Amino acid sequence: LAGMEAAKESGTKDLGKLVSELCGAPKDSVARRGCLLVEEALGNPAFEDLDWIVLTQKAREHGDAGVRAEAARCLGLLDPQLALPVVRQMASKDSSSRVRRAALLAALTLAPPTEEEDCSWALERFGAEESPEVRKALAVALGRHDLALIEKVAKALAVACEDSDWKVAACAAVSLGLTRCDLAPVTLSRLLQTSADWRLRGAAVVGLTKALHPDGLPPIIAALADSEPLVARTAHGYLSSLRPADAPGPDPEVWSQWWQETGSKRPLRDAKAQRERNRKYGYSTSHETIFRGMDVLVLESRGDHIQTVLERLAINHRLTSGAKVPESGLDAGGVFVSNCTGEMEPADIERLDWFVHVGGYLFGSCWALTETIQRLAPGIVGKLPTTGEVMNRVLASPCHKNSPYLEGVFGAGVQPIYSLVGSHLIEVQQPERVEVLVDSVQCAQDHGDGNLACWFQLGHGTIMDSANHFDVQGLTEATHLDKAEDRMAYAMDHMGASFALIRETAKEKFWGSNHRAAQEVFDDSVLRLLSNFVRLRR
């Protein structure tokens, strides 16, 4: 931002010089800022004559893979005619799988595989790539039904269902279903019936649910009897969505009879129903409606207690604990919330790893960053090193005002305060993969960095982390509020309480103490963040 301001005064040439110098800086954190400066300048008519390809060359040739990956991501924002050849070369030639992954996704952004030439390039990379992490990203990217060469894509994904890396195979199985080709139910039914690996059987069920093909329903019904609770619950969750008003339990015979008598006569996709879903899950929808019918599994732990928030809002959920996730079962179409401290056993993490890769959503708070998220996805985000325990209350700000995930989180004139209770602050280790949604200048000044909430994709699924606790927002931890008027002002300024609410409750006795007021006036800003992810998914 300082570079932008300086360039406005001194001219275009100075900005180009600054970008080039930053991109060539030996220190990786400095070099990445050159790419960030390009992103800030894009769209500004004053800088449209600058050759960003040339100016970022030093970043693309940098010795640090993270800088090169950031350069690749930056190229994905430029003119496709200029940037596509460069980024494709990086995707095939760079020695680092991290860089190749970033370049691949940038190339697919610039030229989606909806044209034959672009799809052929993606398929060539899918066959030639050695890194499982990059193959996994490709498998996910090919999970679309609007691609050119769709039959070739389906065949490539069918082959990848037998990949030696289970994560690649699982992602390919889900993507094969998303192609909606006739090959999908045949291949996935066979995988479900023959695989000894519960992870692949579960992925086959998810793929069949995405295929929207009547031939896929009998295998899904048969999966209700699978020995792995995760596979059976995922199958039952999908079947229940087909008859939400009167869904029976997970009895294969009952569901088979329903399918033969009634279910097979109904369409598995309905444009009118989808339009109704779009209306139903609009921004202004209540939390309870957004989560209705969705499996929400919450890890009980020693720190945070989101279940108290869910109970208050009448959101149905289940509880589990460390070492019990396998028997609890996970629905791949659902949500898992890891309360701080997020401590779990290896078998729990193994199930969650599968859950996210095939499309599940995982939300964590505070220590769950270290105890859950880092164990699932090491090296992407981690705990920021601090000199001591983080105990603070900081003003939070949105990083991207136009992000759909932040709708309703920051009301006009409202600045939430995040309560950090022994918090594990977020250190972003792979910036090209992570979007920071909420940060704090005050937190950065006090503790060295200010990332408070972020998200990233893992396989077909999503992980979101918040540095604070879900259940101690609002008046619970507020300080220096001596009078009822102080608490009302706090509720309006930091919790988004409306004038109407304040007028309606101004004479209530609960305003006399923080504890009582917190029971009546709720700060749902963090839950709104979670709800936005679920709403947009549905």
Where are these predicted regions, by residue range?
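Hydrophobic targeting/anchoring helices
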Residues: R233, G237, P248-D295, L299-E300, ...
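Amphipathic alpha-helical scaffolding segments comprising HEAT/armadillo-like alpha-solenoid repeats
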Residues: T12-G24, P45-A59, P80-S92, P112-G127, ...
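Core register positions within helices of long alpha-helical scaffolds
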Residues: A6-E9, L37-A41, C74-L77, A106-T109, ...
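Extracellular ligand-binding/catalytic regions of CAZymes and related secreted enzymes
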Residues: K272-M294, D446-G450, L458-R538
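Conserved hydrophobic register position within alpha-solenoid helical repeats
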Residues: G3, G34-C35, A71, A103, ...
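A glycine-rich, often tryptophan-bearing local segment used as a flexible ligand/cofactor-contacting loop or short
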Residues: E343-Y418
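Helical hinge/lid and interdomain linker segments adjacent to catalytic or ligand-binding clefts
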Residues: M294-L376
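Alpha-helix N-cap/helix-start positions at coil->helix boundaries
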Residues: L1, D28-R32, A65-G66, S96-R98, ...
